Amino acid sequence: MAQTGFGRRYFKAFVSGFFVAVPVTVTVLDRLAYVARVEGASMQPSLNPDGESSPDVVLLNRWSVRNYHVQRGDIVSVLSPKNPQQKIIKRVIGIEGDFIKTLGYKNRYVRVPDGHLWIEGDHHGHSFDSNAFGPVSLGLVHGRASHIIWPPSRWQRIEPSVPPDRRPLLNWDRAAEDKYDDD
């Protein structure tokens, strides 16, 4: 008889915990952060330095991109402009107003329009990025990679950085502000 009471209490505790944990988990994954496995060579050596033998898993922060707080050097997950069923992970090279020297895009120089980003893979020869499809709308950004969480040997925070040879030539909006500043 005592066994039956224990079993019922255990079952009730499990069910009540389940009905609390599931909505909390769904909310966290939907609003705050989620994890993604990085496949391919486009972000080497920053991500997946060993190739497919040990793919990196990253924590993607949704909260930081909700209000379009994206900066140069961030690694972001975006919906592919060419295939909306696919998410791609790339580095932000330019933000709105920046002039970018492209790598094989139809125009040699591009001004990133308002509400857009210029994204590129770190491994230029193996990346399908803005050099192929142009600037990307901020609305396509799903998250900013904040940490590598797998494999354990690579646990680390991901800091924003832009390779020196890929920095924007000029930010048109900032140059206009400097030109007309009355200080």
From Swiss-Prot:
One GO CC term, this protein: mitochondrial inner membrane peptidase complex
Transmembrane domains' residue ranges: 13-35
Subcellular location: Mitochondrion inner membrane
UniProt-listed Gene3D superfamilies: Umud Fragment, subunit A (2.10.109.10)
Membrane topology term: Single-pass membrane protein
Quaternary structure, from the entry: Heterodimer of 2 subunits, IMMPL1 and IMMPL2.
Main function: Catalyzes the removal of transit peptides required for the targeting of proteins from the mitochondrial matrix, across the inner membrane, into the inter-membrane space.
Protein name: Mitochondrial inner membrane protease subunit 2
Organism: Danio rerio (Zebrafish)
Name of the gene: immp2l
